[in-house]
């Protein structure tokens, strides 16, 4: 009622409005002050809602805070958390463990990366892996390459068969993007695909150094496995896909989103592409 009275007071005497409502002047001003205090974050709340829905509920208060900073709203994370609570906004994402597709394992290359997933520039260190995705009764296999510099998906292939054609397609897509990859390290687990002569030959032709995790040690390829966990939590487990084709279409959009819009704390609140661009342009 305080808001309504405040809106009507330009046309009617305040005393009359308070008398009709049987409200004391002190009570009116108390509620009016409280309303104005609450409303001082009205613009911020609109931006929070926009960010939250733009990212389909995938962002918790920490990422919302970082994105708010990117948009010029310099509120701390506690305030953002409180405002999100007031708006009833809560991230629907809960990270889950996953199991990647390994096949037979064996080692033909040393573990050069040795859990050092940092890189000083793009295209110094890449990681790859294969994960299985089940849509109804159909199994799909996703094989991406990630840049350790910024976590960007360089290329990927999704197929119904985890065969070498999938791996070759993924490599070819990556190789055509760059003039030279001399000295790049490409890290993987000990999956059979990465032991294959054809895989090793293609790396050799492009002067790429092969690195392999230790047997049965998922932490040695944590960067690729972390991406799979994020993708499955934010995409696969949040929607019911009617067909493998529907999932593949959604995956294409998700990877575009992941590279260009999804911000990361380790990238100083930037998306992978934004971070790479800034590293080049300064």
Regions picked out by a protein language model, each given a short descriptive name:
Residues 119-154, 160-162:
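An active-site-proximal beta-strand-loop segment
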Residues 2, 26-121, 217, 271-279:
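Basic, flexible linker segments flanking DNA-binding modules
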Residues 204-208, 230-282:
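C-terminal domain-tail junction helix/linker
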Residues 138, 157-179:
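Active-site beta-loop-alpha junctions of metal-dependent nucleic acid enzymes
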Residues 17-21, 28, 48, 64, ...:
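Mobile genetic element proteins and their domesticated derivatives, centered on retroelements
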Residues 16-35, 54-56, 245-269:
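K/E-rich alpha-helical interaction surfaces of small helical-bundle regulatory domains
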């Amino acid at each position: 009622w305080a808001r309504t009275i405040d809106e009507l007071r330009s046309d009617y005497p305040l005393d009359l409005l308070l008398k009709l409502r049987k409200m004391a002047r002190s009570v009116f001003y108390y509620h009016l002050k409280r309303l104005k205090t609450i409303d001082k974050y009205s613009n911020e709340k609109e931006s929070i809602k926009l960010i939250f829905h733009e990212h389909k509920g995938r962002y918790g208060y920490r990422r919302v805070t970082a994105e708010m900073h990117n948009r010029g709203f310099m509120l701390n994370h506690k305030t953002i958390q409180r405002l999100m609570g007031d708006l009833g906004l809560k991230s629907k994402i809960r990270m889950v463990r996953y199991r990647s597709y390994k096949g037979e394992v064996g080692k033909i290359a040393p573990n050069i990366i040795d859990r050092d997933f940092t890189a000083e520039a793009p295209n110094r260190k890449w990681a790859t892996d294969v994960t299985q995705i089940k849509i109804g009764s159909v199994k799909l296999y996703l094989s991406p390459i990630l840049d350790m510099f910024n976590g960007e998906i360089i290329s990927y292939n999704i197929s119904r068969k985890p065969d070498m054609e999938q791996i070759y397609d993924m490599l070819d897509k990556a190789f055509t993007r760059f003039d030279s990859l001399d000295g790049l390290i490409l890290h993987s687990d000990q999956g059979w695909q990465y032991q294959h002569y054809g895989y090793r030959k293609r790396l050799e032709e492009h002067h790429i150094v092969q690195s392999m995790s230790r047997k049965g040690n998922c932490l040695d390829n944590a960067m690729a496995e972390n991406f799979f966990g994020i993708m499955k939590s934010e995409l696969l487990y949040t929607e019911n896909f009617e067909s493998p084709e529907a999932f593949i279409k959604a995956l294409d959009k998700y990877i575009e989103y992941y590279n260009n819009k999804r911000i990361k704390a380790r990238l100083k609140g930037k998306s992978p592409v934004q971070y790479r661009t800034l590293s080049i342009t300064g």
